[in-house]
Design a protein with these regions (language model features):
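"A position-specific structural signal for the A-helix of alpha-solenoid helical repeats
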Residues: 38, 42, 75, 82, ...
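Single conserved hydrophobic/aromatic residue that forms the stacking wall/gate
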Residues: 2-8, 13, 415-425
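Long, internal scaffold/assembly segments composed of regular secondary structure
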Residues: 164-298
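Helix-turn-helix repeat elements of alpha-solenoid scaffolds
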Residues: 18, 52-61, 96-104, 137-154, ...
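Amphipathic helix-loop-helix modules that constitute alpha-helical solenoid scaffolds
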Residues: 20-50, 87-159, 166, 372-414
């Protein structure tokens, strides 16, 4: 009896699961273009199998019109091939040989465009991966590798006979990510703004969720933050707020809310408005920081690192060390994210301040060994400063020490925003 009850319960769960999925698919088809096209193709196939060739062809034409309008190249390719299959099954009635050849040429053109778009997306994916999991370009080898990607992308653009929203979007995404990765923030901001204008002029072309639009807004904010243009940031943060008001998946909305907090917080911290930054944290402590597990790992790391920095600027060294301990306790989970390298540098300062000089020296060696290329100027400055501990006891001596370091700090803060570091593609 127990066994039969379990089987019945499992079947009930499966039936309910199917009902829920069917309802979600039906709701999705109302606003998702890809779902609408797929549904029309499915209807055409049903009509074709029922022997209603004319009706099937008409339904397929509607799907083809939608796919062409929204540049769904992969679906358009499948539709054109299906259309030829239907025509073949109907013995090409009412069609001349010239018309048949024209349809075949359309398939070839679509295939060529699909191949070019796929190569373009692959190049962008490689560049985006480097931006996510590697730091900014520092070595000649990295510079050459990045330039090779740029040349490949330019070659694709030059030989692409098709122009449209998707091509422009991918090209501007690639360029803006390239400039951001190479440290040319002014150029990155300019391209990102062009990309946002492209989305604004084509509101119906945004994905659900609008991942590429989000990448563009975050790219602008990252560039503005790096360039110290804090007064320009609220305008683009407001664009993130508008994304949370739309009917997008909850996971996407939670991610956007986290980035709204992060950029608002770092803007206030960099402006010296520490009290406002602390108040902002209190407003989000329950909704964001106590629900970190709902965020992806890279966002969790950024939020925890932000909390460490907030404690430091508010002169709460003990709380900063506790927050850093939570990051370190996570171990290798965060290791591959670029922000973890920043966390290690901040931890160096905390440990040196506590007098753990042996640990700090070993950590410096570990950080140096963890990269195949040389350390960045910021890392070298942190290493140099940590090795000055214990700091002089007198305020005068500390002032002299700061004067010696101040020039280097200022030079580093301006290095990326004075002149472009790479030629524009």
């Amino acid at each position: 009896e127990i066994g039969s009850g379990l089987v019945g319960s499992e079947m009930c769960i499966r039936d309910r699961y199917k009902v829920v999925v069917d309802c979600l698919l039906h709701l999705r088809s109302r606003y998702d273009i890809q779902a609408r096209i797929s549904n029309r193709m499915a209807e055409a196939e049903i009509l074709f199998r029922c022997g209603l060739l004319q009706a099937a062809t008409e339904e397929l034409s509607r799907a083809k019109k939608l796919a062409g309008q929204y540049e769904m190249t992969a679906l358009l390719m499948l539709i054109r091939q299906t259309e030829l299959r239907y025509l073949s099954a109907g013995d090409y009635q009412g069609m001349s040989e010239k018309q048949l050849v024209e349809k075949q040429m359309k398939v070839n053109e679509t295939f060529k465009h699909l191949r070019s778009a796929n190569q373009h997306m692959q190049l962008y994916d490689i560049l985006k991966y480097r931006a996510l999991y590697r730091s900014k370009v520092r070595s000649e080898q990295e510079c050459q590798s990045l330039n090779d990607l740029v040349l490949s992308e330019l070659h694709l653009i030059a030989n692409n006979t098709y122009n449209g929203f998707e091509v422009d979007k991918l090209h501007q995404l690639f360029q803006s990510t390239y400039f951001l990765q190479s440290g040319n923030y002014k150029a990155a901001i300019r391209i990102y703004q062009q990309l946002l204008e492209l989305f604004d002029h084509n509101p119906g072309r945004m994905l659900n969720p609008p991942l590429h639009y989000l990448d563009a807004v975050l790219g602008v904010l990252d560039s503005l933050l790096s360039a110290g243009l804090y007064d320009e940031m609220p305008f683009f943060i407001a664009k993130l707020h508008r994304l949370t008001e739309s009917d997008y998946p909850q996971e996407f909305v939670r991610k956007v809310l986290a980035f709204i907090y992060l950029y608002d917080s770092f803007r206030l911290i960099n402006c010296g408005a520490f009290a406002d930054a602390q108040e902002l944290y209190k407003q989000h402590e329950e909704t964001l920081f106590r629900k970190l597990s709902q965020q992806k790992l890279d966002v969790q790391l950024l939020l925890q690192l932000n909390l460490v920095v907030l404690h430091l600027v508010c002169d709460r060294g003990g709380e900063a060390r506790k927050a850093m301990t939570r990051i370190q306790a996570t171990g290798l989970v965060f290791y591959n994210f670029p922000a973890f390298r920043i966390a290690r540098l901040v931890n160096l300062l905390l440990q040196a301040e506590c007098g753990r000089f042996d640990f700090a020296e070993n950590e410096i060696k570990s950080i140096r060994r963890s990269t195949a290329i040389g350390n960045s100027s910021v890392e070298k400055l942190v290493f140099r400063f940590v090795r000055l501990f214990p700091l002089p006891g007198s305020r005068r001596e500390r002032g002299r020490l700061w004067e010696r370091l101040y020039g280097t700090v200022q030079a580093l803060s301006l290095i990326h925003i004075s002149e472009p570091t790479r030629p524009e593609p």
